[in-house]
Regions:
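Catalytic machinery of carbohydrate-active enzymes
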Residues: 1-197
Length: 197
């Protein structure tokens, strides 16, 4: 079984790629909101989410409410906490385990994210997940899609090749070992100095 595992992962990656492609093939009818929609995509556990909050508040300054509507697409596990915070206008919960299935749930959620009509989609997670955050970046259909270049702890070369092509920008990362708080600050610094704001 160990011999076949790398090949099974490749097959699985392509199957998800095809499933998502078909789900997003149907013409969408995205909302046309008066404010530019900015998606913040985080699918990680509550510990990483809580550590990110110190940086999260800075996104309100980068994308002020008179011009932008911030929607957090987040893990359902911390939805109740996130919706009480003033850093975003809406929280869009994702049931992570169910999302990583070939299901009506995944199909519908991809369509809902596409229909938000986002202009900007941002995934600040350092260790990106092909089936989760990267798939949601792709589904957003945003003109500007930004993630951390990150590491490959959750991705093989095929997943990295496919997912990187779904982005317009990848924020470079230091090769030095950094804490989660330092990684969050590093990403935001790279994003906020971007010429595309």
């Amino acid at each position: 079984m160990t011999f076949f595992k790398p090949y099974l992962i490749i097959v699985k990656s392509f199957l998800y790629f095809l499933f998502d492609s078909i789900a997003l093939l149907k013409p969408s009818d995205p909302q046309k909101p008066p404010l530019e929609v900015t998606l913040l995509i985080r699918q990680d556990a509550i510990g990483d989410f809580v550590m990110w909050l110190d940086t999260a508040k800075e996104y309100c300054k980068l994308y002020p409410p008179e011009k932008y509507r911030i929607v957090l697409v987040g893990n359902e596990l911390w939805f109740d906490l996130a919706k009480e915070l003033p850093f975003w206008d809406e929280v869009f919960p994702v049931e992570v385990k169910q999302f990583k299935t070939f299901s009506r749930y995944r199909w519908n959620l991809l369509r809902k994210v596409r229909n938000l009509g986002a202009q900007i989609a941002i995934q600040p997670t350092f260790s990106r997940e092909f089936y989760h955050g990267d798939a949601l970046i792709r589904a957003s259909g945003a003109v500007r899609k930004v993630s951390s270049a990150g590491d490959m702890s959750n991705r093989n070369r095929l997943k990295t090749f496919l997912a990187n092509r779904w982005h317009t920008e990848l924020i470079p990362v230091s090769s030095e070992p950094l804490t989660e708080l330092e990684r969050n600050a590093e990403f935001f610094s790279g994003l906020s100095h971007s010429p595309h704001l």
